[in-house]
Amino acid sequence: MTKKKRENLGVAQEIDGLEEKLSRCRKDLEAVTSQLYRAELSPEDRRSLEKEKHTLMNKASKYEKELKLLRHENRKNTLLSVAIFTVFALLYAYWTM
């Protein structure tokens, strides 16, 4: 996803979108794998399916890595929000005493 698009989406929305893409990719990978083992294929068809399988595996791996980074970023954002809330709560408690 381009940086400009990322700026317009929240981290949680990006995570949801990537999880959906990863799910579709895994379903496609299952379909290709079942085609490889289900039918008698010509060597050319087999090579084509194996190439597609390899491409899908690489794509899934890329999505998983990006999801890992986004989840880490989401955790950092959550911790920052909790820290800011705690500071405001302490300031409020101090101010009202």
Curated annotation (Swiss-Prot):
Coiled coil: 2-78
Membrane topology listed for this record: Single-pass membrane protein
PANTHER family reported in the protein's UniProt record: COILED-COIL DOMAIN-CONTAINING PROTEIN 167 (PTHR31759:SF1)
UniProt KW keywords: Coiled coil, Membrane, Transmembrane, Transmembrane helix
Superkingdom in the source lineage: Eukaryota
Gene of this entry: Ccdc167
Protein's recorded name: Coiled-coil domain-containing protein 167
Signal peptide as annotated in the record: none
Protein location: Membrane
Pfam families the record matches: CCDC-167
Top-level taxonomy: Eukaryota, Metazoa, Chordata, Craniata, Vertebrata
Transmembrane feature ranges: 78-95
The species this protein was found in: Mus musculus (Mouse)
GO cellular component, one term: membrane
